[in-house]
């Protein structure tokens, strides 16, 4: 009898891409994917460990599976991805519901782990490699419009606060040819957009082909035909003029760059081991904006890192005002055991102070985003329709070239269509408009 498996994905776009790889591996073994955990013989959680609240969310979900296990005798539960790689066999003590665990480099081992689990044998596969990229596996895509292509895995940067080098291992890249082959398959299958992924995508290297990320992006843009091309995430110290010039010159490469800064204080950037100063970051921003007028810039910000003073916090606010990011992902610092910060620094900013500083960051960014989005009112945006709006089937939701979320009246258009939309109003996170009439403009 065919076993049914449900995979729930937490966290980043790389985890979503990994779930597509895992789905491909398991369907090749004869498993049937189901959406609902209540219908499954096997429940798998693909997990994120980047922040404490992400781990808490996963542990809470594991607690909720205890009731499902009572209702479905023989149910097998697996936890995969960054959380088990981070906590290792301690996961079995954290939750008695877990039957097996596997880290991000061990997904080829899943069929064996699962077979053993159905026989009552617990298992763990947690080896990190310097070679695994899964580049030979055709993902089982979850959508038909946009696709993720992981081009490299891991990170060598060792930022003081970050668990990624411990959960994802050292950097390694796919071959240029394997990436281009996947791009051409997507183009042939009618996909409209692709996103090149990496924990630090700018560090992509294929030494045999003599390719860095700028060359890869250029070659992908040529192979992609009319598909839009995006990429994430970039590290400020690695973004190059060559890369920015590709963004400027290639029409199908979207004018949106995510460039995490974390803090506006050079002192804090040094404590964080970020590898650049405030001035160097601002110089990169100036270089990008000079080459790509109208580019959308987004970032990550941490409030209350170890030793952060009020002056450091004010430096972050002033950098936000100077750069004027289109949007930002904002969090207060939480200690991640095993990181440099946990081992060598003191988490000395009180929780209430972290929350206050974070709220000031959020409030400032909300105002900036509201002004930037408001400036788009009256413009015409070329929008790739992705889905029906959650509020009404008469509306479609999509994204502009600059990664703005745009909601508009659908008329005769369908998801996957590229639509010219006249923007009539905005919020701090969304543009609202109507389809441009034929002959208008």
Curated annotation (Swiss-Prot):
One Pfam family hit: Radical_SAM
Sorted alphabetically, which keywords does the UniProt record give? 4Fe-4S, Cytoplasm, Iron, Iron-sulfur, Metal-binding, S-adenosyl-L-methionine, Transferase, tRNA processing
What catalytic activity is recorded? N(6)-dimethylallyladenosine(37) in tRNA + (sulfur carrier)-SH + AH2 + 2 S-adenosyl-L-methionine = 2-methylsulfanyl-N(6)-dimethylallyladenosine(37) in tRNA + (sulfur carrier)-H + 5'-deoxyadenosine + L-methionine + A + S-adenosyl-L-homocysteine + 2 H(+)
InterPro entries the record matches: Elp3/MiaA/NifB-like_rSAM (IPR006638), Methylthiotransferase (IPR005839), Methylthiotransferase_CS (IPR020612), Methylthiotransferase_N (IPR013848), Methylthiotransferase_N_sf (IPR038135), MiaB_methiolase (IPR006463), rSAM (IPR007197), rSAM_horseshoe (IPR023404)
Intracellular or extracellular location(s): Cytoplasm
Can you cite an annotated GO cellular component?
Answer: cytosol
Q: Which residues are the signal sequence here?
A: none
Enumerate the spans annotated as TRAM domain: 374-437
List, for all copies, the residue spans of the domain called Radical SAM core.
Answer: 141-371
MF GO annotations: 4 iron, 4 sulfur cluster binding; metal ion binding; N6-isopentenyladenosine methylthiotransferase activity
- Keyword hit for S-adenosyl-L-methionine: yes
Which cofactors, by name?
[4Fe-4S] cluster
Quaternary structure (record): Monomer.
Provide the family line. Answer: Belongs to the methylthiotransferase family. MiaB subfamily.
- Name listed for the protein in its UniProt record: tRNA-2-methylthio-N(6)-dimethylallyladenosine synthase
């Amino acid at each position: 009898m065919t076993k049914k498996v449900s995979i729930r994905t937490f966290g980043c776009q790389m985890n979503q891409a990994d779930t597509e790889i895992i789905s491909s591996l398991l369907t090749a073994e004869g498993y049937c994917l189901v959406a609902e955990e209540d219908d499954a013989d096997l429940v798998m959680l693909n997990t994120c460990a980047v922040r404490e609240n992400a781990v808490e969310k996963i542990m809470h979900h594991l607690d909720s599976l205890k009731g499902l296990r009572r209702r479905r005798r023989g149910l097998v539960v697996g936890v995969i991805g960054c959380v088990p790689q981070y906590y290792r066999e301690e996961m079995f003590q954290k939750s008695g519901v877990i039957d097996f665990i596997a880290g991000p480099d061990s997904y080829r081992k899943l069929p064996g782990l699962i077979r053993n689990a159905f026989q009552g044998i617990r298992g763990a596969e947690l080896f990190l490699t310097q070679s695994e990229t899964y580049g030979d596996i055709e993902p089982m895509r979850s959508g038909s419009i946009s696709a993720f292509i992981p081009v490299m895995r891991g990170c060598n940067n060792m930022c003081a606060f970050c668990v990624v080098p411990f959960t994802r291992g050292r950097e390694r890249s796919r071959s240029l040819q394997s990436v281009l082959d996947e791009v051409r398959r997507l183009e042939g299958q009618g996909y409209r957009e692709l996103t090149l992924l990496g924990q630090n995508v700018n560090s992509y290297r294929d030494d045999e082909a003599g390719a860095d990320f700028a060359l890869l992006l250029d070659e992908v843009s040529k192979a992609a035909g009319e598909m839009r091309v995006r990429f994430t995430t970039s590290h400020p110290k690695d973004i190059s003029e060559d890369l920015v010039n590709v963004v400027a010159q290639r029409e199908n490469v979207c004018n949106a760059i995510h460039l995490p800064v974390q803090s506006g204080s050079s002192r804090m950037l040094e404590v964080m081991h970020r590898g650049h100063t405030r001035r160097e970051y601002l110089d990169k921003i100036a270089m990008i904006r000079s080459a790509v007028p109208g580019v959308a810039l987004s970032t990550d910000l941490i409030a209350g890192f170890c030793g952060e003073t009020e002056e450091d916090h004010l430096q972050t606010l002033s950098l936000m005002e100077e750069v004027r990011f289109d949007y930002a992902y904002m969090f207060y610092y939480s200690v991640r055991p095993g990181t440099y910060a946990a081992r060598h620094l003191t988490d000395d900013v009180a929780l209430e102070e972290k929350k206050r500083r974070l709220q000031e960051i959020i409030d400032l960014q909300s105002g900036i985003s509201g002004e930037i989005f408001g400036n788009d009112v009256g413009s015409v945006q070329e929008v790739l329709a992705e889905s029906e709006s959650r509020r009404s089937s008469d509306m479609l939701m999509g994204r502009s070239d600059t990664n703005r979320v745009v909601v508009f009246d659908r008329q005769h258009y369908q998801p996957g269509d590229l639509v010219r939309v006249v923007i009539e109003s905005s919020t701090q996170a969304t543009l609202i408009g109507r389809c441009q009439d034929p002959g208008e403009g």
